[in-house]
Amino acid sequence: MNSWNLSSSIPIIHTPHDHPPTSEGTPDQPNNNRKDDKLHKKRGDSDEDLSPIWHCVVSGGIGGKIGDSAMHSLDTVKTRQQGAPNVKKYRNMISAYRTIWLEEGVRRGLYGGYMAAMLGSFPSAAIFFGTYEYTKRTMIEDWQINDTITHLSAGFLGDFISSFVYVPSEVLKTRLQLQGRFNNPFFQSGYNYSNLRNAIKTVIKEEGFRSLFFGYKATLARDLPFSALQFAFYEKFRQLAFKIEQKDGRDGELSIPNEILTGACAGGLAGIITTPMDVVKTRVQTQQPPSQSNKSYSVTHPHVTNGRPAALSNSISLSLRTVYQSEGVLGFFSGVGPRFVWTSVQSSIMLLLYQMTLRGLSNAFPTD
């Protein structure tokens, strides 16, 4: 098999002419493989057995973690832009990246909150892909549900189930990203945690355990439609890419360049569409309790202004109204540049590695 091709458990829908009829499984000669053959052709798996669910779980966890790691610094820039829209030095994506790098460094600046992100990255991605694949197979094979509805529903359900794992890490990550380095002399975020452990202890002690799920509804309002759209787009783009490759005389599996392109387009498009809810989610999860609004958080520079917007609430509708009243329509697209880059590149990395790991596991643990 050409090293530029990948096997996949993600379906590519073939036309009836993609696979020539065989003498096995005809109406006159039924056999036990007929049902499986029909399902494989509907799903477009190139007549290869579908990967076991545990392959999808492991592959998804690896792809998600590496993708998140690679793009964390850009996610930090997006968080600063959304959490501090009034700070001029963070308004431009490139200059914001450079400013954070020069002022705060890589580890505590651009990669602030990295350990918090990794706390939920692998398990949540593993749960998502396992749920997504199981739901998709059940809906298509057992219930004969329309493909587009299936992909939207599977992405929606996968993200909902994994949210119980990633939301607490998202709260901690976002606050640490907004804070930057400890005793930050360059930006007063409203938080000053010395490390991840201190952040967990402080949040639970001062705000209660439930605060780790603060903004849960806002997070779901962003992530459920994002995942549903991302994978519906991804499945459709892969089908189109496969048809194009078929016209060029290639059949069976999608080439790596097209795997990268389809993943990037799916993630980037879904990212742009869901940016308004990403803004609300960031504001909700990083707002300060009223009792701490006048508290100085920078020991070395206690009078540095934070440029933070007014506190919102846990209400999505009120948060949307507050953003609109204070910043207008453009406020809903604060950080859209880095979010587009992040979601497109992260999606391409994650989904490419997902496919590659699936192939490796299939070779190491064949199902035949």
UniProtKB/Swiss-Prot annotation:
<feature type="transmembrane region" description="Helical; Name=4">
    <location>
        <begin position="219"/>
        <end position="239"/>
    </location>
</feature>
<feature type="transmembrane region" description="Helical; Name=3">
    <location>
        <begin position="149"/>
        <end position="165"/>
    </location>
</feature>
<comment type="function">
    <text>Transporter of the mitochondrial inner membrane that exports magnesium and thus, plays a key role in mitochondrial Mg(2+) homeostasis.</text>
</comment>
<dbReference type="InterPro" id="IPR018108">
    <property type="entry name" value="Mitochondrial_sb/sol_carrier"/>
</dbReference>
<feature type="repeat" description="Solcar 3">
    <location>
        <begin position="254"/>
        <end position="360"/>
    </location>
</feature>
<keyword id="KW-0496">Mitochondrion</keyword>
<protein>
    <recommendedName>
        <fullName>Mitochondrial magnesium exporter 1</fullName>
    </recommendedName>
</protein>
<feature type="transmembrane region" description="Helical; Name=1">
    <location>
        <begin position="56"/>
        <end position="77"/>
    </location>
</feature>
<dbReference type="GO" id="GO:0015693">
    <property type="term" value="P:magnesium ion transport"/>
</dbReference>
<dbReference type="InterPro" id="IPR002067">
    <property type="entry name" value="Mit_carrier"/>
</dbReference>
<keyword id="KW-0813">Transport</keyword>
<dbReference type="Pfam" id="PF00153">
    <property type="entry name" value="Mito_carr"/>
</dbReference>
<dbReference type="GO" id="GO:0015095">
    <property type="term" value="F:magnesium ion transmembrane transporter activity"/>
</dbReference>
<comment type="similarity">
    <text>Belongs to the mitochondrial carrier (TC 2.A.29) family.</text>
</comment>
<feature type="transmembrane region" description="Helical; Name=6">
    <location>
        <begin position="332"/>
        <end position="353"/>
    </location>
</feature>
<keyword id="KW-0999">Mitochondrion inner membrane</keyword>
<dbReference type="GO" id="GO:0005743">
    <property type="term" value="C:mitochondrial inner membrane"/>
</dbReference>
<feature type="repeat" description="Solcar 1">
    <location>
        <begin position="51"/>
        <end position="138"/>
    </location>
</feature>
<feature type="repeat" description="Solcar 2">
    <location>
        <begin position="146"/>
        <end position="240"/>
    </location>
</feature>
<feature type="transmembrane region" description="Helical; Name=5">
    <location>
        <begin position="260"/>
        <end position="280"/>
    </location>
</feature>
<feature type="transmembrane region" description="Helical; Name=2">
    <location>
        <begin position="115"/>
        <end position="135"/>
    </location>
</feature>
<dbReference type="InterPro" id="IPR023395">
    <property type="entry name" value="Mt_carrier_dom_sf"/>
</dbReference>
<keyword id="KW-0812">Transmembrane</keyword>
<keyword id="KW-0677">Repeat</keyword>
<keyword id="KW-1133">Transmembrane helix</keyword>
<feature type="region of interest" description="Disordered">
    <location>
        <begin position="1"/>
        <end position="48"/>
    </location>
</feature>
<dbReference type="GO" id="GO:1990616">
    <property type="term" value="P:magnesium ion export from mitochondrion"/>
</dbReference>
<keyword id="KW-0472">Membrane</keyword>
